[in-house]
């Protein structure tokens, strides 16, 4: 076994097993819930925001589905859609980074792993970024960082509240230091947004890990999370081996983080839009008046 193979095997077990075990059947009329085993009619699952009606398990959804659930119908206006990543390091492990990018772009129809734009929630304007785990595990490279930074800067300039839906394995190793510097770049933009006394809310979904957790995911005025989402920096196995202690079964879950003060509230997906609207109202946001009124 080569050094790379050894490292890859170790990395596979770095995070809680649920992430890899929750793969769902993507074709057909029925979906089996990985939490309770219930077989659900796909249309019924989608009608319930992809939440299992039997156990409440939140199935993973893509960025398009997320936008439909949050934004007023027809209100989302995408920004920087044509920004596309390059391969500045000529990186290659088992496969070339350029090949991985092309594969992810073909399978998702996206240029990179985040969609950014402006929208309304019950008539109230808001800037929103939605990370998509389908694209290379939602990893944060230079384009993801640039798009989020541009969105934060636009929100600051226009006096808008900001929501970032996080779903990521962390910084994209194929871009090396260029990916790591996005942590500081986004954090700096968020600090200027905070200085303008504007609301920022990250929504932590399953999973939110690595460099994303270590930067903008934890810098919100109000930190929201979906039920049972995996949230952490290093993986469970790494922490246990470092501390030489057994960690609690619910360690790195949204519920554990809320109990220890790292998450403000856990919001079921079916209640998210209503909750966001209430929080926007609470922070003084007002609905736009219809034209001619």
Curated annotation (Swiss-Prot):
A zinc finger (C4-type) spans 33-55. Binds 1 zinc ion per subunit. It is found in: Cytoplasm. GO terms for biological process: fatty acid biosynthetic process; malonyl-CoA biosynthetic process. It comes from Prochlorococcus marinus (strain MIT 9313). The keyword Hydrolase does not apply. This is Acetyl-coenzyme A carboxylase carboxyl transferase subunit beta. GO terms for cellular component: acetyl-CoA carboxylase complex. One of its GO terms (molecular function) is zinc ion binding. Zn(2+) binds at residues 33, 36, 52, 55. Pathway: Lipid metabolism; malonyl-CoA biosynthesis; malonyl-CoA from acetyl-CoA: step 1/1. Residues 29-293 form the CoA carboxyltransferase N-terminal domain. It catalyses: N(6)-carboxybiotinyl-L-lysyl-[protein] + acetyl-CoA = N(6)-biotinyl-L-lysyl-[protein] + malonyl-CoA. Keywords: ATP-binding, Cytoplasm, Fatty acid biosynthesis, Fatty acid metabolism, Lipid biosynthesis, Lipid metabolism, Metal-binding, Nucleotide-binding, Transferase, Zinc, Zinc-finger. It is an enzyme of class 2 (transferase). Its cofactor is Zn(2+). Its EC number is 2.1.3.15. It holds the Pfam family Zn_ribbon_ACC. Component of the acetyl coenzyme A carboxylase (ACC) complex. Biotin carboxylase (BC) catalyzes the carboxylation of biotin on its carrier protein (BCCP) and then the CO(2) group is transferred by the transcarboxylase to acetyl-CoA to form malonyl-CoA. Coiled coil: none annotated. Acetyl-CoA carboxylase is a heterohexamer composed of biotin carboxyl carrier protein (AccB), biotin carboxylase (AccC) and two subunits each of ACCase subunit alpha (AccA) and ACCase subunit beta (AccD).
